[in-house]
Amino acid sequence: MMQLPILPQNNVTVATPGTDPMIDPETGKPRGRYAVVSLGCPKNLVDTEQMLGRLDADGYRMVDSVDGADFVVVNTCGFIDSARDESMAAIDEMLALKRDGKLRNVVVTGCLAERQQDKLLQARPDIDALVGVFGRNDIVSVVDELYSGLQEQRTIFKPAAVNPLSDAMRSAVTPRHFAYLKISEGCDRLCTFCAIPKMRGKHFSKPIEQIIDEAKRLGDSGVREVVIVAQDTTYYGMDRYGEPRLNQLLKELDKIESIDWIRLMYFYPMYIDDALIDTLASARRIVPYIDMPLQHASDKMLKRMARKTTRSLQTDIVQKLRSRIDSLVMRTTMITGFPGETEEDFVELMDFVQESRFENLGVFTYSIEEDTPAARLPNRVDPEVAARRRDDLMELQQQIAFDWNDSRVGGTEEVLIDAEMPEQDNVFIGRTRSEAPDVDGLIYVSQVDPDSPVEVGQIRPCEIVASQGYDLVAAAT
């Protein structure tokens, strides 16, 4: 899970000297200064950006620290125990500042707010407003009412949307050269361990033309890499068109000249057919990278998880993707300690990972989610056993990842430069086509030729000169 430093946007109005900084002289509306804490997945980050866009358009001014803020928006994650703990810690930190008189209001939004609703207000009565996932379009009215002197707590919880919410009105908080693009909301999968459908509702897809318009806007604003996200990317279109339409969408996205890289996240093994693989293999802008969370490899565990797949089917799809897409890099996630997992099941998982050799892999220990079928399953696994299995799996994956990075030394790869290295002259941080933002390794790039400066946002050919575990060292050519 990530907590992002949210920086002020360049297009906000700055108070004129001698005027009340809380009133916009042009609109007469209240204009408070606000800070944001954004937690959780990239899909939640897009929601954060959408709320910021609405606040900015209404005259509120974002600042880069809570020290200079009148109010704070905490956009929470409620996915697993560790995410909930992180969200509660962030809320408590902001409420402490409010009690000390350093913040006027604390607004809590997102998945934890949606999941707990009144329980959260009972536990933290100092929260001024609670906004659920589908109330985010009303963030301005919530803040306006707080500034008008409303004393009661404000809550906005709406039913899951049946039409997609537009993300066009966004204030980007990622570096300007990459952005996440959400193509759908919610999920129709009924995985027994997962509470996302309870927080995000059923799957609904944006129209293709709306996604293309949002992508073009991103490209025209200077975005070089667009990262496609959804709860279930390959299910795109089923609700709207009656059949999967990811293939058609990707063909249209691949035509956008202003975008260099398109990256695909959250693939589900179902609906990956030959036509889609052909598109992935032949596209000019879609990078050879697929994030496909598989969760397990034991048929017994997959059945108990209601994944509607088998180890054999997963092996077949991994092999087919690798054989058809040149230089494909794959990322997946696994769960250890799911109820009923035996040592034999775990050995099957280890064997599958050894066989598949995913370049990037994350592991979670099972987290009990209230009101999910898995929470009622017998044969709970001891948390220490689940943690030991996680560590064993990560030790195996570490060797696979390190071997893969070692094999890249001496080659030349294009690197998207994300940032300057703090306190080191002429050293930069970037990623190749093989690394997604926030979750994969980094490339440390040295500028060798002073007459050919490296700049943030460039896609720069670099020679890989050394491996440092999960990360690489490179020299700009």
From Swiss-Prot:
Alphabetized InterPro entries for the sequence: Elp3/MiaA/NifB-like_rSAM, Methylthiotransferase, Methylthiotransferase_CS, Methylthiotransferase_N, Methylthiotransferase_N_sf, NA-bd_OB-fold, Ribosomal_uS12_MeSTrfase_RimO, rSAM
E.C. no: 2.8.4.4
Ranges of residues in domain Radical SAM core: 173-403
Keywords linked to the UniProt accession: 4Fe-4S, Cytoplasm, Iron, Iron-sulfur, Metal-binding, S-adenosyl-L-methionine, Transferase
Cofactor binding remark: Binds 2 [4Fe-4S] clusters. One cluster is coordinated with 3 cysteines and an exchangeable S-adenosyl-L-methionine.
Catalysed reactions, as listed in the record: L-aspartate(89)-[ribosomal protein uS12]-hydrogen + (sulfur carrier)-SH + AH2 + 2 S-adenosyl-L-methionine = 3-methylsulfanyl-L-aspartate(89)-[ribosomal protein uS12]-hydrogen + (sulfur carrier)-H + 5'-deoxyadenosine + L-methionine + A + S-adenosyl-L-homocysteine + 2 H(+)
Start and end residues of each MTTase N-terminal domain: 32-148
Protein's GO biological process: tRNA modification
PROSITE patterns registered for this protein in UniProt: MTTASE_N, MTTASE_RADICAL, RADICAL_SAM
Cofactor dependency: [4Fe-4S] cluster
Cellular component, GO annotation: cytosol
Molecular function as annotated in GO: 4 iron, 4 sulfur cluster binding; aspartic acid methylthiotransferase activity; metal ion binding; protein methylthiotransferase activity
Residues at which [4Fe-4S] cluster 2 binds: 187, 191, 194
Chief site of localization: cytoplasm
CDD domains per UniProt: Radical_SAM
Positions annotated to bind [4Fe-4S] cluster 1: 41, 77, 111
Keyword 4Fe-4S attributed: yes
Enzyme class name: transferase
Region (Disordered): 9-28
Subcellular location: Cytoplasm
Gene3D superfamilies noted in UniProt: Methylthiotransferase, N-terminal domain, Nucleic acid-binding proteins, tm_1862 like domain
Keyword Iron annotated: yes
Membership in a protein family: Belongs to the methylthiotransferase family. RimO subfamily.
Known function: Catalyzes the methylthiolation of an aspartic acid residue of ribosomal protein uS12.
Name of the protein in question: Ribosomal protein uS12 methylthiotransferase RimO
Species of the source: Rhodopirellula baltica (strain DSM 10527 / NCIMB 13988 / SH1)
